Design a protein with these regions (language model features):
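Perimembrane loop-to-helix junctions flanking transmembrane segments
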Residues: 37-51, 176-186
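Short acidic alpha-helical/loop segments enriched in Asp/Glu that coordinate divalent cations
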Residues: 170-176
Length: 273
């Protein structure tokens, strides 16, 4: 894989990932979701107004996703970063146990951050925020930064989700596994939760391809349990968590590139010896 190929693939993986997160989240706003009411209440917004705001928020999310795919601007990506971060922060603010849901949402707010880093957001002028966002030029420094953020993202979302089973003991998880015939109970989801927490630490400390591929498969399967348990309408829960699948793919691309680069450099050195 050449640097140019990595650049293009990584760029599109992250764009599609961020867009899917917003499409899935936005769809629930358009449909309206009772589970959102505590978020509005935490900001002093009464339920009757919250129900009316949900479709507006949902439609805006979907519009941002379409713009990111069709006509991206850095200001749109910055909005997506801020909004995804805020909706993640709302979860502990609204009374969900601990901060596990915030960390589990790392796959929503860190992909936009990676897109901004790719596009040189730190060194931009004000007018650049509104200009077209073309495919960024990669270099070794950016590759290293993205490698770290991908590892961090995967670790956080695994540890956050693991906390649901290990500490919060969410009944939802029991229902998920029961939907595919696994006789799950509190002890079972405790064990799965600790497994995910340990897996998150391992990914951060030892990001090797077999482990990352396992994480990708694990997240696709376990997040699809929303659909097996709740029906096809919950496909939007699966789509909303696209960061759980897209970020491992991004890390796999980076590791493959770095491995091939190391092998290419090693050949001339061996010949010189």
């Amino acid at each position: 894989m050449t640097l140019e190929q990595l650049q293009t693939r990584l760029h599109w993986v992250l764009r599609i990932t961020a867009a899917c997160c917003f499409i899935g989240h936005g769809a629930w706003g358009v449909i309206t979701k009772e589970g959102w009411l505590p978020f509005f209440r935490s900001q002093g917004i009464p339920d009757d107004i919250a129900w009316k705001l949900m479709p507006i928020i949902g439609a805006l999310d979907i519009i941002m996703a379409i713009l990111l795919l069709m006509k991206p601007r850095r200001i749109i990506i910055m909005w997506m970063l801020i909004w995804a971060l805020w909706t993640a922060i709302l979860r502990p603010i609204s009374g969900t146990p601990g901060t596990w849901e915030f960390w589990e949402r790392a796959g929503n707010f860190l992909p936009p951050l990676m897109l901004l880093i790719l596009g040189g957001a730190i060194a931009m002028k004000w007018k650049d925020w509104f200009s077209g966002y073309t495919e960024p030029k990669m270099d070794d420094d950016k590759i290293g930064v993205l490698h770290f953020i991908c590892r961090l993202t995967i670790a956080l979302l695994l540890i956050g989700h693991g906390g649901f089973g290990a500490f919060v003991e969410k009944g939802m998880l029991i229902n998920h596994f029961s939907s595919i015939g696994i006789p799950a109970d509190v002890g079972f989801i405790n064990a799965v939760g600790w497994f995910e927490i340990i897996l998150g630490v391992v990914v951060f400390a030892l990001p090797i391809l077999p482990i990352i591929w396992f994480v990708f498969a694990w997240k696709v399967i376990t997040e699809f349990l929303y659909v097996t348990e709740g029906g096809i309408i919950n496909i939007f829960e699966f789509i909303e968590r696209w960061g759980d699948y897209g970020v491992p793919i991004a890390l796999i691309l980076i590791i493959n590139y770095q491995t091939r680069q190391s092998a290419t450099k090693a050949v001339p050195e061996a010949q010189a010896d």
